[in-house]
Amino acid sequence: MTYYGGKELGAAFRTVRKNTIQIAEDIPENKYDFKPAPDTRSVGQTLVHIALSSGFQHHVHSNKINDLKVVNFPELMEKIGSEEAKPRDKAQIIAMLKSDGGKFASYLESLSESFLAEQVMMPPGAEPATKSRFEMLLSPKEHEMHHRAQLMTFERMIGVVPHLTRERQARMAQAQPAQR
């Protein structure tokens, strides 16, 4: 028995996605084109990238691929890249975050411990040579958290206090003893 299975993976992913959606809602639509530097993704592009980023892992594991050398990486990356490039407004991006996130979380919740324990061969030359499906399926959450940290920095740059900071500030204010 493990302490962290499919249900826990799904719940953790839902929590991370909920926070990403809150950031997407907090940033004004007229700031979705904001880029902190010319050669980086904009707010909107980063959110779309997040929404689509679980697609690779979903493809690998829902198709029960056990050796990544059979994956046509150029074709898959081209497909994801063309989907990322489609223009979308704020409402469409938030809807995509909700829909794709919900589908992936539900998929995670359906997975058995035995499936999560299966080993998948990495591409030739990769270290380690194999990874468990469990480890691989953690990566979309980790990847999203990486980009969410970027988005929270973007928020500060455009004058928005991140929601987690606002919540912490509210808790701290409530904890202060009443002033006389």
Give the residues covered by each predicted segment:
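Generic detector of intrinsically disordered, low-complexity, polar/charged segments
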Residues: T2, E78, K98-S99, R156
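Membrane-helix exit/interface motif
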Residues: P28, Q57-I65, L108, S112-F115
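Acidic/histidine-rich alpha-helical segments that form the ligand environment
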Residues: K79-M121, T130-H146
